[in-house]
């Protein structure tokens, strides 16, 4: 089977009702990104940051995967699918995708404040545990913090993502502005002979001269059309 590698951004989950910090409305309107999505913001006011992510976790319990998520999972019948996502939700998992690389962390996990990427201190939260409190400790005795890659922090999974992109036969970009690095740079690792598709209702600057099939649609409609293009009807 061919290797199908999909890079998804906020537009993938927007149809499920998850607000992004680039959109008006929603949780992100109440706080500047610097307050709730940087290491400095966390050091300044850990309680504010922890409560902000508690609210995001609660929101995640109230939304469902959309048809786009489900269609990507269905493509596993025909392709070796790897989903590389900039999203921190678990909607790809809940839709049935089995191979996902989370570049920016996972909302459903918490970790050590001192050593965020030490696997011994990363904990998966059950749905009923969405609320983390000040004083909840990781295995090393530090405050449990969200397992999120904040602005200014390294992206440990980027090398894993590059390895999959370098082997792609088909590379698909869905719902990302390609403005956030290092994820935006993944396009440069796509092999020369691979097909590239871009699904987004808005124009996106891909910063490349290579040929790209553009589907100017939202995630669900775009993935539906992509499926028809990749698997023609008999």
Swiss-Prot record:
Limits of the Deacetylase sirtuin-type domain: 1-234
Residues forming the catalytic site: 104
UniProt keyword list: Cytoplasm, NAD, Transferase
Gene Ontology CC terms, in alphabetical order: cytoplasm
Species, as recorded: Bacteroides thetaiotaomicron (strain ATCC 29148 / DSM 2079 / JCM 5827 / CCUG 10774 / NCTC 10582 / VPI-5482 / E50)
Lineage: Bacteria, Pseudomonadati, Bacteroidota, Bacteroidia, Bacteroidales
Pfam families assigned: SIR2 (PF02146)
Catalytic activity reported: N(6)-acetyl-L-lysyl-[protein] + NAD(+) + H2O = 2''-O-acetyl-ADP-D-ribose + nicotinamide + L-lysyl-[protein]; N(6)-succinyl-L-lysyl-[protein] + NAD(+) + H2O = 2''-O-succinyl-ADP-D-ribose + nicotinamide + L-lysyl-[protein]
Domain of life (superkingdom): Bacteria
Compartment(s): Cytoplasm
Residues that, per the record, bind substrate: 53, 56
Full protein name: NAD-dependent protein deacylase
Class in the EC hierarchy, top level: transferase
Single Gene Ontology MF annotation: protein-succinyllysine desuccinylase activity
Binding-site list for NAD(+): 9-28, 86-89, 175-177
Gene3D superfamilies, A to Z: SIR2/SIRT2 'Small Domain, TPP-binding domain
Xref: HAMAP family: Sirtuin_ClassIII
Family: Belongs to the sirtuin family. Class III subfamily.
Function: NAD-dependent lysine deacetylase and desuccinylase that specifically removes acetyl and succinyl groups on target proteins. Modulates the activities of several proteins which are inactive in their acylated form.
E.C. no: 2.3.1.286
Entry's free-text remark on domains: 2 residues (Tyr-53 and Arg-56) present in a large hydrophobic pocket are probably involved in substrate specificity. They are important for desuccinylation activity, but dispensable for deacetylation activity.
């Amino acid at each position: 089977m061919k290797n199908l590698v999909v890079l998804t951004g906020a537009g993938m989950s927007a149809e499920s009702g998850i607000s992004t910090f680039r959109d008006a409305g929603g949780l992100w309107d109440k706080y500047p990104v610097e307050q709730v999505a940087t290491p400095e913001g966390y050091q300044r006011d850990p309680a504010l940051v922890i409560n902000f992510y508690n609210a995001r976790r609660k929101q995640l319990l109230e939304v469902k995967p959309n048809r786009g998520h489900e269609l990507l999972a269905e493509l596993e019948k025909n392709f070796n699918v790897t989903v590389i996502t900039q999203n921190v939700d678990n909607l790809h998992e809940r839709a049935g995708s089995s191979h996902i690389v989370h570049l920016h962390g996972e909302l459903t996990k918490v970790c050590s404040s001192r050593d965020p990427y030490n696997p011994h201190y990363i904990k998966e939260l059950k749905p009923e545990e969405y609320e983390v409190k000040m004083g909840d400790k990781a295995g090393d005795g530090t405050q449990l913090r969200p397992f999120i890659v904040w602005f200014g922090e390294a992206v440990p999974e980027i090398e894993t993502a590059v390895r999959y992109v370098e082997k792609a036969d088909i590379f698909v970009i869905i719902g990302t502005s390609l403005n956030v690095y290092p994820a935006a740079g993944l396009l440069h690792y796509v092999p020369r002979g691979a097909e590239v598709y871009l699904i987004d209702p808005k124009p996106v600057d891909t910063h490349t001269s290579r040929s790209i099939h553009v589907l100017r649609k939202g995630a669900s409609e775009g993935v539906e059309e992509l499926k028809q293009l990749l698997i023609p009807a008999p």
